[in-house]
Amino acid sequence: MARKKTLDFEQSLTELQTLVERLESGELSLEESLGAFEQGIRLTRECQASLSQAEQKVQILLERDGELSEAPFDTEGDEA
């Protein structure tokens, strides 16, 4: 299954919820379950990275001498 390079946060979260429902249904084979679990781990990491990036951006905005200003946030791996 080919996927885009990265999904946005909402798409990743929706896909993760779908995977959890499939795993909880108990209807997947062992191989299918392992594949779904691996994909779920990848999606979880993508979601965590998105949340971390958003949190850091909020901190940058709030830590500018009490004034609301935005500074560029240099993220690793965005253009990989």
Curated annotation (Swiss-Prot):
Localization (cell): Cytoplasm
Keyword presence, Nuclease: yes
Coiled coil: none
Keyword Cytoplasm: yes
Organism: Pseudomonas paraeruginosa (strain DSM 24068 / PA7)
Keyword terms of this UniProt record: Cytoplasm, Exonuclease, Hydrolase, Nuclease
PANTHER family: EXODEOXYRIBONUCLEASE 7 SMALL SUBUNIT
Assembly behavior: Heterooligomer composed of large and small subunits.
Name this polypeptide is given: Exodeoxyribonuclease 7 small subunit
